[in-house]
């Protein structure tokens, strides 16, 4: 069992929105690993970061991602920082990984004042976002088998683009 598609990208790139719509188009389930982490731990991600630190959060995240990659056969959405873990990047090999690309300007606009995103909290959000983009873009690009620009594109157009580039067996299911 393996996911039909694994979505990666920065906060605000549309992983949850696109993921739900893509899953519907393919007639499969959707799993957001951030939600799975919160369900497993019984704690919000921001609390895990604040109490246990980013390192512990990434350890839990890697366990959840590895399990999802073997147990979930629908569309999987990873947290924005999951690719910073070498173990997660290794586990993604051989999967259909879709990088939802976004500019810093659009990402800051979409994330607004969302306090659920611990790495973007506080002042200078735009600068923090640009730093995350610079740090993570090379990791996303290396992990991705499909890249799609989400800037100024509606979710329906992004989903259609992804479906058109999925391996034939998955794309055929979406057409039926």
Curated annotation (Swiss-Prot):
Its main location: cytoplasm. ATP binds at residues 12-17, 117, 153. Its cofactor is Mg(2+). Keywords: Amino-acid biosynthesis, Aromatic amino acid biosynthesis, ATP-binding, Cytoplasm, Kinase, Magnesium, Metal-binding, Nucleotide-binding, Transferase. Pfam families: SKI. Binds 1 Mg(2+) ion per subunit. GO terms for cellular component: cytosol. Mg(2+) binds at residue 16. One of its GO terms (molecular function) is magnesium ion binding. Monomer. This is Shikimate kinase. It comes from Mycolicibacterium paratuberculosis (strain ATCC BAA-968 / K-10) (Mycobacterium paratuberculosis). The gene is aroK.
């Amino acid at each position: 069992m393996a996911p039909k598609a694994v979505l990666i990208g920065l906060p605000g790139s549309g992983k949850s929105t696109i993921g739900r719509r893509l899953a519907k188009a393919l007639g499969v389930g959707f799993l957001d690993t951030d939600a799975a982490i919160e369900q497993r731990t019984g704690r919000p991600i921001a609390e895990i970061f604040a109490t246990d630190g980013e390192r512990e959060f990434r350890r839990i995240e890697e366990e959840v991602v590895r399990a999802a990659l073997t147990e979930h056969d629908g569309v999987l959405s990873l947290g924005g920082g999951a690719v910073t873990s070498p173990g997660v990047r290794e586990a993604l090999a051989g999967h259909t990984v879709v990088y939802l690309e976004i500019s810093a300007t659009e990402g800051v606009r979409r994330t607004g004042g969302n306090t659920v995103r611990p790495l973007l909290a506080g002042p200078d959000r735009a600068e923090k976002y640009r730093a995350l983009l610079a740090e993570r873009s090379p990791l996303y690009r290396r992990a991705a088998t499909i890249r799609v620009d989400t800037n100024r594109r509606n979710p329906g157009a992004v989903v259609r683009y992804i479906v058109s580039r999925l391996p034939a067996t998955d794309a055929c299911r979406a057409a039926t």
